[in-house]
Amino acid sequence: MKDFNINKLVRPNVAGLKPYSSARDEFKTQGAEMVFLDANENPNDNGLNRYPDPQQTSVKEKLSETRGVSPNNILLGNGSDEVLDLIFRAFCEPGKDNVITLPPTYGMYKVLSDINNIENREVLLNHDFEPDLTAIFKQITKDTKIIFLCSPNNPSGNSFEAEKIEMILEKFNGLVVIDEAYIDFSDSKSWIHRLEDFPNLIVTQTFSKAFGRAGIRLGVLYSSDEIIAILNKIKPPYNVNQLTQKESLKILFNLDSIKLQVAEIKNERTILSKQLLEVNFVSKIYRSDANFLLIEVDHANKRYDQFLEKGIVIRNRSNQPLCENCLRITIGTKEENKKLIKAFKELENE
């Protein structure tokens, strides 16, 4: 990109803010030696009576070791939706700026656009679920602040071609957000290792998918020091609670079990794909780098209701662009997948 300057993108009112600073930050190293009577907490120690570390230092340090990215390039949030919302609030002027999204894609980009009163310019993926570069560049205006790329994409499951992503990063002078919620199920490399090459790059990940902790709500954002510093100005002081910080550290110190689970899910994905090919009302199975499969069936609404009657909840995506008569199926355990295939076979014979 030419002459990229993050200070030209940030909202003026945000540029003048200072990040929240806890009065205790300067006493961190002294810890137990100090008597803390500053924050009106309950003084009786139960392990959770104190406010959590607002900078989540221990989690960032371990995550840095795991992902190979400096702690200074990491921001944590209450789920990925919070860090995505922070990007809107830091860089987009309500009623003036616009963002570009590529349907079919993750629905929260549009929701956050609407909440923040930002125009959402939708550019459909092509029929291979790949970005249409010509159409994207035609939609860019002087007020386009962000392009959102979900890769691996939800609901299609495919990873976008690296060459196309790189071209967007190089030609667009705004921010490019790559949502990698499903990256651990893919053989593609994460874009976090290209942060130094592209100052306009933001990558988001989550603990909800491969790490199996949707219940703790922890989202991760990786970007340049400058972008992280701007987002820290508007981040709520204690946005990641102590229980979440403790649980996330347990996960990061036990990644071998996570890797085994991911390998099992990928193996089940392959098995399930082959079995679904044999079902007569399944017309197409899309290639997936995620923990789900998008399949095309004869009548999605009918099949969705039939699975509900059998006690199996899947996702009907047929109301999304390019997804007519498509169902999205999460890869379950071996036992759950067997029940799913059994239901498919029963419906096939009805």
From Swiss-Prot:
InterPro entries: Aminotransferase_I/II_large, HisP_aminotrans, PyrdxlP-dep_Trfase, PyrdxlP-dep_Trfase_major, PyrdxlP-dep_Trfase_small. GO terms for molecular function: histidinol-phosphate transaminase activity; pyridoxal phosphate binding. One of its GO terms (biological process) is L-histidine biosynthetic process. The keyword Transferase applies. It catalyses: L-histidinol phosphate + 2-oxoglutarate = 3-(imidazol-4-yl)-2-oxopropyl phosphate + L-glutamate. It is an enzyme of class 2 (transferase). SUPFAM superfamilies: PLP-dependent transferases. Its cofactor is pyridoxal 5'-phosphate. Keywords: Amino-acid biosynthesis, Aminotransferase, Histidine biosynthesis, Pyridoxal phosphate, Transferase. The modification N6-(pyridoxal phosphate)lysine is found at residue 209. Its EC number is 2.6.1.9. Pathway: Amino-acid biosynthesis; L-histidine biosynthesis; L-histidine from 5-phospho-alpha-D-ribose 1-diphosphate: step 7/9. Homodimer. Belongs to the class-II pyridoxal-phosphate-dependent aminotransferase family. Histidinol-phosphate aminotransferase subfamily. This is Histidinol-phosphate aminotransferase. The lineage of its organism: Bacteria, Pseudomonadati, Bacteroidota, Flavobacteriia, Flavobacteriales.
